[in-house]
């Protein structure tokens, strides 16, 4: 491990188009090969589709989707005396949000659909309605933590 000081966390600035921090984080997760404008266009198009289909505010729906996909606990591997235990641990809010965004993007990419904007819009609408793969992944993570509750005393 490095002996230097840990890098300072830079503040996430709100997205210029939507004036929302989560939107900035989502653009960063969507971006491939440094193509930020493409990622911004995908998110903007997805929000347009959401507004078209539901008639509600896409930013509100997006925030609900992220909240519904955010895990509260996770399991982490811990070696104790030659055995590896899956130890349930609480997830910090920042990490939980990052995990939710990662899952939303990954499951959007693996969906069937025309464009990435269509796939992302579909996944966000599903997550906002407590359905979809990202929410299922959160439930799975919570079940794993519940099943391994006996090893909670190994927390570090």
From Swiss-Prot:
Belongs to the universal ribosomal protein uS7 family. PROSITE patterns: RIBOSOMAL_S7. This is Small ribosomal subunit protein uS7. The gene is rpsG. GO terms for cellular component: small ribosomal subunit. It holds the Pfam family Ribosomal_S7. HAMAP family: Ribosomal_uS7_B (MF_00480_B). Part of the 30S ribosomal subunit. Contacts proteins S9 and S11. InterPro entries: Ribosomal_uS7, Ribosomal_uS7_bac/org-type, Ribosomal_uS7_CS, Ribosomal_uS7_dom, Ribosomal_uS7_dom_sf. One of its GO terms (biological process) is translation. Keywords: Ribonucleoprotein, Ribosomal protein, RNA-binding, rRNA-binding, tRNA-binding. GO terms for molecular function: rRNA binding; structural constituent of ribosome; tRNA binding. One of the primary rRNA binding proteins, it binds directly to 16S rRNA where it nucleates assembly of the head domain of the 30S subunit. Is located at the subunit interface close to the decoding center, probably blocks exit of the E-site tRNA.
